[in-house]
Curated annotation (Swiss-Prot):
<dbReference type="Pfam" id="PF05189">
    <property type="entry name" value="RTC_insert"/>
</dbReference>
<keyword id="KW-0436">Ligase</keyword>
<dbReference type="Pfam" id="PF01137">
    <property type="entry name" value="RTC"/>
</dbReference>
<dbReference type="InterPro" id="IPR017770">
    <property type="entry name" value="RNA3'_term_phos_cyc_type_1"/>
</dbReference>
<dbReference type="InterPro" id="IPR013792">
    <property type="entry name" value="RNA3'P_cycl/enolpyr_Trfase_a/b"/>
</dbReference>
<keyword id="KW-0963">Cytoplasm</keyword>
<dbReference type="InterPro" id="IPR000228">
    <property type="entry name" value="RNA3'_term_phos_cyc"/>
</dbReference>
<dbReference type="InterPro" id="IPR013791">
    <property type="entry name" value="RNA3'-term_phos_cycl_insert"/>
</dbReference>
<dbReference type="InterPro" id="IPR037136">
    <property type="entry name" value="RNA3'_phos_cyclase_dom_sf"/>
</dbReference>
<keyword id="KW-0547">Nucleotide-binding</keyword>
<feature type="binding site">
    <location>
        <begin position="283"/>
        <end position="286"/>
    </location>
    <ligand>
        <name>ATP</name>
    </ligand>
</feature>
<comment type="function">
    <text>Catalyzes the conversion of 3'-phosphate to a 2',3'-cyclic phosphodiester at the end of RNA. The mechanism of action of the enzyme occurs in 3 steps: (A) adenylation of the enzyme by ATP; (B) transfer of adenylate to an RNA-N3'P to produce RNA-N3'PP5'A; (C) and attack of the adjacent 2'-hydroxyl on the 3'-phosphorus in the diester linkage to produce the cyclic end product. The biological role of this enzyme is unknown but it is likely to function in some aspects of cellular RNA processing.</text>
</comment>
<keyword id="KW-0067">ATP-binding</keyword>
<dbReference type="InterPro" id="IPR036553">
    <property type="entry name" value="RPTC_insert"/>
</dbReference>
<dbReference type="GO" id="GO:0006396">
    <property type="term" value="P:RNA processing"/>
</dbReference>
<dbReference type="InterPro" id="IPR020719">
    <property type="entry name" value="RNA3'_term_phos_cycl-like_CS"/>
</dbReference>
<comment type="similarity">
    <text>Belongs to the RNA 3'-terminal cyclase family. Type 1 subfamily.</text>
</comment>
Amino acid sequence: MIEIDGSFGEGGGQILRTSLTLSALTKKPFRIYKIRANRPKPGLQRQHLTAVEAVKKLTNAKVKGDFVGSTELVFEPEDIVEKGDFEFDVGTAGSVTLILQTILPLLINRNIKVTIKGGTDVPKSPSIDYIRLTFLSLLEKIGIRVNLILIRRGHYPEGGGEIKITEVKGNPSSFSLMERGELLMIKGISHVSSLPSHIAERQAKSAKEFLLSKIKIPVEIEIDVRENERSKGSGIALTAIFEKTFLGSDSLGEKGKRAEIVGEEAAKSIYEEIISNATVDRHMSDMLMLYASLYYGEYIGSELTSHARTNSEIIKKFLNVNIQISGEKPFIFRAKKEL
């Protein structure tokens, strides 16, 4: 059984999520201890338990220690199920995108439909529009096509969001994202839920003005206004579309934060990614690591975070893969077959 120190490195929920995904794919059981030991609320929280429950159901796993506050978990998976219709509720505003990240590799070419309820646009996790604009676009580049439907948005603290994954198809193989090609345009989505539409418009205007002051390319930002949602909130996500890759950013509104600041934050963030010469943005360089390790890929990430470093160490525990990381800002990630 693979033993994992949950307080190692960055020491957050990502260690558990990566372990769950790879345990399911390799059918290797693991024990994780000292879960989130250095965090203000140590142990498993509702968010993490939903990830455990999701992979447990998708693999008929035997699990010990799956309760709130638990600092140790034993996970023994069986084969991934071939078909089914599943629903997972993260509760209030727990992130649906972190659950999606955990289970997505398990769904490839299986007749499985999944509904995830919770927060779609919440702090400390990728927004649903970042996922749709950047993450899924990059997955398509490496041969994985995901059909994702956003049914309702959910913001912190009320949540109430819902997404559906109806199909994940693909034939992923080794990939190289070492060149960007020309920057073609920037696309985005600026949204509000149960708030005046001018907030979304101001976010978009501010982002567009900042970007056009820096680069002369087309900027198209769609306005998404949703009324009568359970939660109130706003946000914006942007993606820079290159000939060979996508770079993304996002920013969320909050009480007392002007819409113009929200828009400018996302614009500044994507501009920094554009001038970094990376082929994959800061968030994506962490998220893509798993896929690069499974299918032998290489890319240039804009910044090597402690999150990403920790992730690479967990991957090595499950996969017999030769991982090479060089540089920091930007950094090159390469995964090759272990000879």
